[in-house]
Amino acid sequence: VTARVLLDCDGVLSDFMGGVMPLINSILETSYTVDDVTEFSFAAALKLTPDQASAVKRSIGRTPRLAANLNVYPGAVDGVRRIREIAEIYVVTSSWDSNETWEFDRKAWLKRHFDIGHHDIVFTAAKHICVGDVFVDDRTETLAKWLEHHPTGTAVQWQTPHNRRDRWNGWSTNSWDELFRIVEFVRPFGTEVVA
């Protein structure tokens, strides 16, 4: 029995903030960088007014093929390939609902870069309903909720500038080598320990 690994996409595999930062700077006539986003909500981190936040979110929703054009984080392709040698991988990701092509583009992006097919992708904001042995996400709040529902699972915070201030007592890394080692030693869900 192999372990089942649930991977978030944005912030773990794809550089969502790097993709939307040019939109933010264009709309607001600013020069923010990804490092300026020090919490999960970019609107809160950048201290955007409600009108500014709405304008940016509308732009994200209206930008064709945004999800298809996001950059892959360095090391992610090789990291996923290595983990697939020892575990099942499913991508559990939220959709940007106002962007009509988001899910289609995300599926094509995952297939193109990682050879992950549509049967291995779950679109949901309710990630806690997904069962796995290891769950990797950049949103600390999502990890905590998943762990509440799967107390024998292993939740891994993927380190980013926007979660570095979060309180988290569990696994935390942005190293594919370290994640590989974590997955190697996880006992798959449902297997019994023989004494």
Each language-model region and where it sits:
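Active-site neighborhood of HAD-like aspartate-dependent phosphohydrolases
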Residues: 1-54
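Metal-dependent phosphoesterase signature
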Residues: 30-34, 42-81
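Substrate-recognition element of Asp-dependent hydrolases with the DxDx(T/V) motif
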Residues: 66-72, 76-106, 110
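Substrate-recognition "cap/lid" segment bordering the active-site pocket of phosphatases
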Residues: 92-147
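Short acidic-hydrophobic, aromatic-tinged amphipathic segments that line or gate anion-handling sites
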Residues: 120-124, 170-181
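Acidic, Mg2+-coordinating phosphoryl-transfer loop and its flanking beta/alpha structural elements
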Residues: 136-177
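Short amphipathic alpha-helix with an adjacent loop that forms part of the alpha/beta core around
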Residues: 177-192
